[in-house]
């Protein structure tokens, strides 16, 4: 068993990648600037982080930043991707893991989704960006680093009901404690 692990560990995880493709190895970090520590701010940041997360090959429990040290699925993929026999195809179909590429992760779209989520929570001046960080040992592998700047949220300054008839006005006054919108809350 030790011999097979050593043989597999000598296999390249990038040898069957298409020309110009880069293997995604996870998120290096998500840097948050001007973080809002309020409950709505934490909820917004949780959704933003979920939108940016994408597990790489051999992710540990679906984590986008922690990986198992042995990419067994990629090794099997590279060893059996071009096999024609029944056994080779069976092993490939059961054990292989298709490489997750930077283009598959699509970080451009992910930062746009994250920015839209910030807008939904009232952070209209929020900004998101990403950077591809190449692996120093293998330029065909890279991690992503995201930057999220929350800035101050827009809040509700005043709430007015206009052109309300007398009866409706008294109903509104009677149920004022049940309102959904309150002055000072995030524009959400």
Descriptions of predicted regions:
Residues 1-2:
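Sec-dependent signal peptide recognition
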Residues 7-10:
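C-terminal motif of bacterial Sec signal peptides marking the signal peptidase cleavage site
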Residues 12-188:
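Interaction-mediating elements
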